[in-house]
Design a protein with these regions (language model features):
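Flexible glycine/proline-enriched surface loops and loop-helix/loop-strand junctions
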Residues: 229-233, 251-258
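An extended, acidic, His-containing surface patch that forms the Zn2+-binding/catalytic region
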Residues: 87, 110, 124, 221-222, ...
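Bacterial Sec-dependent N-terminal signal peptides
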Residues: 1-42, 508, 514
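A short core secondary-structure module
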Residues: 198-203, 258-281
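Acidic/His- and Gly-rich active-site-bordering loop/insert found
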Residues: 42-149, 170-179, 360
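Short, solvent-exposed loop/turn segments at the edges of secondary structure
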Residues: 26, 98, 134, 178, ...
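Acidic/histidine-rich catalytic neighborhood of metal-dependent amide-processing enzymes
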Residues: 146, 152-235
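A common structural junction motif
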Residues: 121-122, 277-281, 379-386
Length: 514
């Protein structure tokens, strides 16, 4: 009973029983207020306890460094925490650079239709410690914020998953619920899933029996809408760009003394090509996914701006001009090429190197063919001496079509963030999600936390951090999703059965894995 209900009950008592003495009525009012206050204190205390536990778990998880290739120790830590919370843990692969496991409300062998929360154990390097306010693997908790590599990408989400799912352990032990809920932890996402998601898809999908997945991708921001700058807007990714990593090399024999430079030499050729590439303004390309994003965004905006966004093709010049002013938004409409490495063979300062290498991190829109992209790249580089080699390339996948699981999740978002906006979109980066989309599983990329631009810019650089409030809100959203899920009947058939290992295996036993 809330405060309003207490006042109504007390007023009704006074009206119905006028013989109640004022002193007694005052005592009733005082006791009613005391009950309300006590319950309020209990709620605050429970919230504080949850916040403290969430912060502690994330801090400890951060402290176990798990730079790609060294995931096992952190994987063992978080799998132990899942067991302590009462989840059923199944280890799929167990090696230092390939630790993959599931933690579920019910054992996987029951083959219940499964809602899967996907996260990756690995993180990128912490970089230079001196650039951090607190060391990258300290897990420092300062002013209700957890600091460290992986807090946003994506150990924070893993803790949200764990806190939300484990709250249903007692209920699952007493009821035969219609769905299983599983936390899937994988390795190697930062190097495109060859030691994690790819192995799961090749060998363990029948065990998971996944009917929906939630993974990384979009996030919430409250700095988007012109007339409602405080209104949170959540972006849920239904598809994503794919990655193409390239190595450029110039191997050119020329005279070697820096005091007498020849007309052409390796570093000059490379710099000229890269200069043209980095100055080129990428073409704005509309496809069904990013047009849908603009239209959904336009529904939230008011006035002329909203009208223009809802008709992006007709107002293409205006929309393109606006996109170019926002690199984050523009990246969902362009093929990008980012120079991440540039090096020459080690020589003396006065010695001209004969070999120079550069690396490009390219992200391609789903409809872009690799061959055509490479042809355009070669034309831009403009020099036959610059060779191009593909280092790594990820696969396309069909976009996820929103279904009833999408509706359930958006309802949960709206309950925790009343009045929020929701925009389906094409994620401009690359995650493990496409592996599972290619298996026919609907995958929604979203971390339900509201982060400002300042926090989002810490991903993959120094001072990455996540407010504890974001942990709590995200946990509430996932808990609401699970609760609503259990009100539904399974509507999808299990995936067809294929052979899969029953026991933990060492990755070396999988013959097809490099």
């Amino acid at each position: 009973m809330d405060k309003a209900e207490h006042w109504f009950a007390v007023s009704l008592a006074g009206a119905s029983f006028p013989f109640i003495r004022p002193a007694v009525l005052g005592w009733i009012i005082l006791m009613s207020l005391s009950v309300v206050q006590l319950r309020s204190q209990e709620m605050v205390s429970a919230s504080d306890t949850l916040a403290s536990e969430a912060a502690r778990l994330l801090s400890e998880y951060i402290q176990v460094s798990s730079v790609t290739g060294t995931e096992r120790e952190a994987g063992e830590y978080i799998s132990d925490k899942c067991r302590e919370k009462g989840l059923h843990v199944e280890i799929f692969t167990d090696s230092i650079d390939c630790y993959n496991f599931a933690a579920s409300l019910y054992p996987l062998e029951l083959q219940k239709p499964n809602a899967v929360f996907l996260s990756h154990i690995d993180v990128v390097s912490g970089g230079t410690d001196s650039l951090w306010t607190y060391p990258p693997f300290s897990g420092a908790v300062v002013s209700d914020t957890v600091w460290g590599r992986g807090t946003i990408d994506m150990k924070g989400a893993a803790i949200m998953y764990l806190m939300a799912t484990s709250s249903f352990v007692g209920r699952a032990s007493m009821e035969d619920l219609p769905f299983n809920v599983t936390l899937l932890f994988v390795s190697g996402e930062e190097t495109y899933g060859e030691r994690g998601a790819e192995i799961i898809c090749d060998y363990f999908m029948p065990s998971l029996n996944a009917v929906v997945m939630l993974g990384e991708g979009g996030i919430g921001t409250a700095e988007l809408l012109s007339d409602e700058p405080d209104k949170p807007v959540f972006f849920i990714s239904l598809s994503e760009k794919r990655a193409l990593w390239l190595e450029l090399e110039v191997n050119y024999q020329a005279s070697g003394h820096g005091a007498v430079p020849p007309s052409d030499y390796a570093t000059r050729m490379m710099i000229h090509g890269l200069y043209d590439l980095t100055r080129r303004e990428p073409e704005i390309t509309f496809n069904n996914d990013n047009k849908g994003m603009l239209r959904a965004y336009g529904e939230l905006e008011k006035g002329l701006k909203g009208f223009i966004l809802r008709h992006p093709v007709f107002f293409r010049p205006l929309v393109a001009s606006g996109l170019r002013k926002n690199p984050l938004m523009a990246s969902a409409f362009t093929n990008t090429s980012t120079l991440t490495h540039l090096a020459s063979e080690e020589t003396a300062i006065n010695q001209i190197p004969h070999r120079v290498k550069a690396c490009l991190d390219c992200r391609l829109l789903p409809e872009t063919e690799t061959g055509r992209f490479l042809d355009n790249l070669a034309a831009t580089l403009g020099h036959d001496e610059v060779s191009v080699r593909i280092v790594s390339e990820t696969r396309n996948a069909p976009p996820t079509v929103p279904d009833h699981f999408y509706d359930i999740f958006t309802e949960s978002l709206e309950e925790v963030y009343p009045g929020c906006g929701i925009v389906p979109f094409l994620f401009p980066a690359t995650t493990d999600n496409n592996y599972f989309r290619n298996q026919g599983v609907p995958v929604y990329g979203i971390i339900p936390a509201v982060l400002d631009q300042r926090l989002m810019e810490t991903i993959h650089t120094h001072n990455e951090r996540l407010p504890v409030e974001a942990l709590l809100k995200g946990t509430e959203v996932y808990r609401g999703f699970i609760d609503r899920l259990f009100m539904k009947s399974p509507e999808e058939e299990p995936l067809p059965e294929t052979e899969a290992g029953d026991a933990p295996i060492d990755v070396s036993e999988l013959q097809d894995i490099p």
